[in-house]
Amino acid sequence: MNSVDLTTDLQTLLTGENVQMNLSVPHLVEKILERKEGVLTSSGAVRATTGTYTGRSPKDKFIVEEASTKDKIDWGAVNQPISEAAFDRLYAKVLGYLKERDELYVFEGFAGADEKYRLPITVVNEFAWHNLFARQLFIRPEEHDKKPEEQPFTILSAPHFKADPLVDGTRSETFIIVSFEKRTILIGGTEYAGEMKKSIFSIMNFLLPEQNILPMHCSANIGEEGGTALFFGLSGTGKTTLSADPKRKLIGDDEHGWSSTGVFNIEGGCYAKCINLSEEKEPQIYNAIRFGSVLENVVVDSKTGEPDYSDSFYTENTRAAYPIDAIDNIVKPSIAAHPQTIVFLTADAFGVLPPISKLTKEQAMYHFLSGYTSKLAGTERGITTPEATFSTCFGSPFLPLPAHVYAEMLGRKIDEHGVGVFLVNTGWTGGGYGTGERMSLAYTRAMVQAAIEGELDKAEMRTDRIFGLHSPVHVPGVPDQVLDPAKTWTDENEYEEKAIHLAKAFKQNFKKFSNTENIEKAGGPLV
């Protein structure tokens, strides 16, 4: 099947009588309820459930091995190759399947808030609720927008279509397959809506660096007087909490590009975790869940329609999808100047990293590549011990190119714009998990504020002899003792032992990278 056939077949699909094109939010909600795909909750949001898969299926994700891209992609466990022939066969099957549906829902929009770099996208859905999700998460066209000249990237989403691994070359009945040459993403066998969002992010991670734009898995905000800040961090590090600052406007909560003119949101909405969500803790998210929003896998009372955010019956990974303008305190459009401050968040459950450190460019590149946090792994006897976790560039599942490409771009941009980069430990202090305690949120907020406001630029620093990190001796609003992790432990020898253990884990993890020897030498632990 050549690209001409593919385009013609797609056009035939998109002009079929079963196609519902660019439906409004109320119309989509009507369809969802009519088709019993979801229920209306007391806040007016739609709740849908996703069946077997309540999260992404990374082992079922493939990139087509094509002449134009095969030498650029970092093939391996994250970027698994699949042949063009296998893609073409599956494409024809999915197309045939979608043509036979009684209704299809199509959204035409964009990824990328900066008009110079935005990517036109077309999302074709078997489910009306998936189309509402796409409409709220991606960028909705304005009336004055011209029809894009560039061929859109198309998502064909067929959750009820299941692959046959023996025939189709997939690992299971579920598949997420990207073809860069054919500008198409096939999704089947999973109802989890996040696959659409993250597939578009993955392709932006491939396309943007070609335009000298750094794609980033981070949140971003800006102060009243300017001063853009970026927050990187894996799940549980406090990224959402710390970037939702009432004194600062939100640019975006998850995916951004950094171009020669500044930063821009890749999306037009938010996909927020909502396990244990409360109005007191996260008012921005809580109040954004209203008519037009989508709740995914949240338990809802069948009589009152009240969501129970504390109930993880379906999954811990409950989500809310809503347009960014459901939040009051935002930048419109979602574009801002070059960042002044970058914050890497880590929840160190070993309790050995300083609460805040100012990083050199090389240390910033090292910690960006490392993407460290720790998770608490439960054992059968109920004992929980910390485990070091590393996710390259804080977004390992979404990086098609070799990691050093992203790290080198970050290094160049830090140099060009004189950006202050900080590593902030929101994890444990006074000992590891089980003996120490979680870092006070008030102290973390004070440290982040001091970093963003430039108060640490000329502060007196102490250098950690294990990690080589430079930490301020004083931060307004934080006791001095808290700033030196060794001093918070009752046994400094035990602290040193645990710190060396973590430093070795960093070094072990770094062995997987190529072309990074200089970064490790100048930015890694000293032991």
Curated annotation (Swiss-Prot):
GO cellular component, one term: cytosol
Subcellular location: Cytoplasm
Swiss-Prot/TrEMBL catalytic activity: oxaloacetate + ATP = phosphoenolpyruvate + ADP + CO2
Gene: pckA
Keywords (A to Z) from UniProt: ATP-binding, Cytoplasm, Decarboxylase, Gluconeogenesis, Lyase, Manganese, Metal-binding, Nucleotide-binding
Lyase among keywords: yes
Cofactor binding annotation: Binds 1 Mn(2+) ion per subunit.
Protein name: Phosphoenolpyruvate carboxykinase (ATP)
Gene Ontology annotations of biological process type: gluconeogenesis
Pathway the protein takes part in: Carbohydrate biosynthesis; gluconeogenesis
Pfam families, A to Z: PEPCK_ATP
